Amino acid sequence: MTKQKKFITCDGNQAAAHISYMFSEVAAIYPITPSSTMAEYVDEWAAAGRKNIFGETVLVQEMQSEGGAAGAVHGSLQAGALTTTYTASQGLLLMIPNMYKIAGEFLPCVFHVSARTLASHALCIFGDHQDVMSCRQTGFAMLCEGSVQEVMDMAAVAHLATIKSRVPFVNFFDGFRTSHEIQKIEMLENEDLAGLIDQQALAEFRQRALNPNNPVARGMAENPDHFFQHRESCNNFYEAVPAIVEEYMNEISKITGRPHGLFDYYGCLLYTSPSP
């Protein structure tokens, strides 16, 4: 029997918050325009007792700054809890030091970003991609959406892919243009996505959690001869990411009927060759 589709009217921030709530056990938050409503939705749902995909209520903790939120994400991930945060602009820049650590330790998580101009000679709260482009070198994979429906679909891809690949993701979309655009979209629900989680990868993530009964040393100092080899070994994880993302795009397409791919081609191809 075909499941009847459910539609809602929402903006991009609500779509991202809806998906992230499903896959998160902890949300470390700090408000910054135009991402603030994502955290507000998650806080509201947690207070109302809404259950995530694991049948639990998300633990929401507001920190003293975006840097504190990123540090809380890092610590929570090390403790074996799936964790997320929401930010933009200078707030994202404050998270960069922890992003290097999260990516370097292959901790699966998603940062949801409503991309916004960075303040320079003056403050500007409107959208561009200066903030997310400042994070390309951190080791986070990136997914970008251009519509509210894409936010709903691709946010799910980001959360599913990060669990399987261990590579953290920045999931971003244009501040205001998409974050506050209100559209009628198809809603993905817990039962749609629960079966797509790689349970073995999730169990392995939890087994790697810091535990006083099974102590390990992490973040030690290394000499260059070892350090560069360990950095090179990371490439195996990153090389696997495109195939994993495409796999989950295909799975979401099966549920929704909307095609998603790593590359979508539009228009005509013009080929010219020199005269003989």
Over which residues does each language-model region extend?
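Conformationally flexible catalytic loops at phosphate/diphosphate-handling active centers
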Residues: 54-58, 169-264
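Thiamine diphosphate
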Residues: 1-134, 139, 156, 175-176
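Conserved thiamine diphosphate
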Residues: 125-175, 187
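Flexible, charged surface loops at secondary-structure boundaries
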Residues: 20-22, 266-270
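Conserved small/polar residues in nucleotide/adenosyl-binding loops
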Residues: 271-276
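Generic recognition of flexible, low-complexity loop/linker segments
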Residues: 15-17, 159, 259-265
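Hydrophobic alpha-helical scaffolding
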Residues: 6, 10, 28, 63, ...
